[in-house]
From Swiss-Prot:
Keywords: ATP-binding, Glycerol metabolism, Kinase, Nucleotide-binding, Transferase. The gene is glpK. It catalyses: glycerol + ATP = sn-glycerol 3-phosphate + ADP + H(+). Pathway: Polyol metabolism; glycerol degradation via glycerol kinase pathway; sn-glycerol 3-phosphate from glycerol: step 1/1. It is an enzyme of class 2 (transferase). ADP binds at T17, R21, T265, G308, G409, N413. This is Glycerol kinase.
Length: 499
């Protein structure tokens, strides 16, 4: 705990894939200052994605200064700082100079595909799944780190001599903000590295050996809510969580069975499973989230590949809407989709199907189908895919979802939110505060330093702007969903495997 009596603000740093943001909250969790800066995306080869870690730190530092200036407050009035970040993105730097030895390898980057294939050939897939809760995929940090050590001249030797440090973006920012004094991460970020045992809560020696990672490179792993150190200007750094886990906490989904969906380009669904690390039978990830005091809780995570991107396709490729916001109007003009289903398997299907060979399709077309029906079917597809993942989660953990909390750009679409409630048969709650990812980091930091007294105080601040209650009867709901499942089956295994 620190003395926060005269300090009435918390800063959340939200370090994302395309931009760095700083958001300042007051004691009522109102936003009083914001700043955002984009940074460059580097694509050195097809399927490769990199960021410059120095540019990430520079943009993040600048947004802090700008947000403070906008709010008209000084560092001395800030009780603590919380960090939420793009997960899995990997940085390796020289601990003496603070200079990266290579660009950050971003979560989207697929360069370590062959490393993952070799891990599977060597029979490590089941051990990785059991230990980390993750699938053997280039998405996660461990194989990215191995690639850097294997491909940057002298990196492996220097790492073994203890000269290099590894971190995800949270670790990198804290190391820079503290002037190289603190090398730390939290459990949520560690759980995304493919090197962390989510049951023992330790770096896993066998996985480090398999990947050839020197243990001395790795940060200390701590809870998501505690004081880790101080910035050079004296602000306590007191909260860390990966972006999706931070949104889960910002939505106050801290009890088992509570879930949130972030509707972005894709959709990220997380369900809190409490102290049970539930192993999925449906290809969902088992990951670490934040409990009521920022301690370790477990969650199931599933991703829908094409959510908001389906609406972008209507706008940019088909050109049947001028603005994503117009889709609500057109979808509401017709009483139903007239039997049309759009399956947006543009890049295959994610959870729970995991079919990279599926391709998108429109079904149920007749001469009576209008553009409005197709627009409606596109929005409905986002809700159907969300149900696919939530049904899998409920089957895995044996818990019934009481309500779904929502955030992200598409939640402004009232038609989509109502149809989501209808097809789930569950209330959908849209919060007044849309900045739930940054809010989660602020809450974690504020709890650690005594800025907020506890969960009850935070729950009082979680104002639901609108609740969407299901309006379809059970027969209608299941008939519509059966049509969706039939449509999905017709898209499966479409692409030739050799293609």
């Amino acid at each position: 705990m620190t003395d926060t009596q005269d300090k009435n603000y918390i800063i959340a740093l939200d370090q994302g894939t395309t931009s760095s943001r700083a958001i300042i909250f007051d004691r009522d969790a109102n936003v009083v200052g914001t700043s955002q800066r984009e940074f460059a995306q580097h694509y050195p080869q097809a399927g490769w994605v990199e960021h410059d870690p120095m540019e990430i730190f520079a943009t993040q530092s600048a947004t802090m200064v700008e947000a403070l200036a906008q709010a008209g407050i000084s560092h001395a009035q800030v009780a603590a700082l919380g960090i939420t970040n793009q997960r899995e993105t990997t940085v390796v730097w020289d601990k003496e100079t603070g200079r990266p030895v290579y660009n950050a390898i971003v979560w989207q980057c697929r360069r370590s595909t062959e490393i993952c294939a070799q891990l599977k050939r060597d029979g490590h897939e089941d051990y990785i799944r059991e230990t980390t809760g993750l699938v053997t995929d280039p998405y996660f940090s461990g194989t990215k780190l191995k690639w850097i050590l294997d491909n940057v001249d002298g990196a492996r030797e220097r790492a073994e001599r203890g000269e290099l440090l590894f971190g995800t973006i949270d670790t990198w920012l804290i190391w820079k903000l503290t002037g190289g004094k603190v090398h730390v991460t939290d459990y949520t970020n560690a759980s995304r590295t493919l090197m962390f045992n989510i049951h023992s809560l330790q770096w896993d020696d066998k996985l480090l050996e398999i990947l050839g990672i020197p243990r001395q490179m790795l940060p200390e792993v701590r809870p998501s809510s505690e004081v880790y150190g101080h910035t050079k200007s004296g602000i306590a750094i007191a909260g860390i969580a990966g972006d999706q886990q931070s949104a889960l906490f910002g939505q106050m989904c801290v009890e088992p069975g509570q879930a949130k969906n972030t509707y972005g380009t894709g959709c990220f669904l997380l369900m809190n499973t409490g102290d049970q690390a539930v192993k999925s039978s449906h290809g969902l990830l088992t990951t670490i989230a934040c409990g009521p005091r920022g301690e370790v809780a477990y969650a199931l995570e599933g991703a829908v590949f094409n959510g908001g991107s389906t609406v972008q396709w209507l706008r940019d490729e088909l050109k049947i809407v001028n603005d994503a916001l117009d889709t609500e109007y057109f979808a509401s003009k017709v009483k139903d989709s007239n039997g049309v289903y759009l399956v947006p398997a543009f890049t295959g299907l994610g959870a729970p199907y995991w079919d990279p060979y599926a391709r998108g399709a429109l079904f149920g077309l007749t001469r009576g189908v209008k553009v409005d029906h197709i627009i409606r079917a596109a929005l409905e597809s986002i809700a159907y895919q969300t149900r696919d993942v939530l049904d899998a989660m409920q089957q895995d953990c044996g818990q019934r979802l009481s309500e779904l909390r929502v955030d992200g750009g598409a939640v402004a679409n009232n038609f989509l939110m109502q149809f989501q409630a209808d097809i789930l048969g569950t209330c959908v709650e849209r919060p007044q505060m849309r900045e739930t990812t940054a809010l989660g980091a602020a809450y974690l930091a504020g709890l650690a330093c005594g800025f907020w007294s506890g969960l009850d105080e935070l729950r009082d601040k979680a104002i639901i702007e609108r609740e969407f209650s299901p309006q379809l009867d059970e027969t209608q709901k299941e008939k519509l969903y059966a049509g969706w499942k039939k449509a999905v089956e017709r898209t499966r295994d479409w692409e030739d495997h050799e293609a």
